[in-house]
C-alpha cells in the first residue's frame, strides 16, 4: 500500500503495535518516505525520469540500503521514481474524455498520480459532456485517464482537532 497519510499519529502507533494489523505478521509492507520525497518520486515517474538524488533522509533509517553520493559537499540519497500499476484519483469535475479539474488540496498529488499510473481510474463529483470544461482550468488531460465514473455518496471527513488545555495566568 502506498499512501501519504494512513492515519492520525496515535492510530499509526496502534497499527504498528497490533500483531494482527499486518505489519508484524508480514502481510503489509511499510516504507516510510518523507512527504517531499514522496511527491518528487511520483513527479519523476510522471515525467519518465527513473531516479533522482535528494539530501532528505540522509543519516537516518530511511537511508538504509540506498546509494549515497556527495554533491557540492552535501550527501544525497538516490531515490527511485515511484510508478503505479493503478492510480485512483478523485476530481471535482471531469468530462467523458477523462479531462479532470480538482478542487483545493486535491491538486497536490492527484494530477501527478494520474500521470504516474499505468492505468488511471478517476472518480468525479460531476461528469459532463466533452467540450463543457474550459481548457484553461483542466489539471489532468484525458490522455492520462483510462476509466472515469461519477461517484455517488460522499462523506465529508474532518480530522479530529487536538489542542492543549489553556493554562491559567
Region roles according to the model:
Residues 1-169:
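Conserved alpha/beta enzyme-core scaffold
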Amino acid at each position: 500500500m502506498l499512501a501519504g497519510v494512513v492515519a492520525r499519529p496515535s492510530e499509526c502507533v496502534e497499527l504498528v503495535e497490533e500483531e494482527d494489523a499486518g505489519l508484524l505478521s508480514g502481510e503489509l509492507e511499510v516504507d516510510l518516505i518523507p512527504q517531499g520525497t514522496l511527491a518528487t518520486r511520483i513527479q519523476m515517474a510522471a515525467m519518465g525520469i527513473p531516479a533522482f538524488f535528494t539530501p532528505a533522509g540522509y543519516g537516518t533509517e530511511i537511508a538504509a540500503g540506498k546509494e549515497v553520493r556527495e554533491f557540492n559537499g552535501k550527501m544525497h540519497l538516490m531515490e527511485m521514481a515511484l510508478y503505479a500499476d493503478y492510480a485512483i484519483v478523485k476530481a471535482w469535475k471531469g468530462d467523458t474524455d477523462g479531462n479532470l479539474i480538482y478542487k483545493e488540496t486535491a491538486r497536490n498529488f492527484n494530477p501527478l498520480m494520474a500521470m504516474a499510473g499505468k492505468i488511471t481510474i478517476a472518480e468525479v463529483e460531476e461528469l459532463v459532456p466533452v467540450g463543457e470544461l474550459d481548457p484553461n482550468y483542466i489539471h489532468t488531460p484525458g490522455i492520462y485517464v483510462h476509466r472515469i465514473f461519477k461517484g455517488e455518496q460522499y462523506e465529508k471527513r474532518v480530522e479530529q482537532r487536538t489542542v492543549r488545555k489553556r493554562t491559567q495566568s
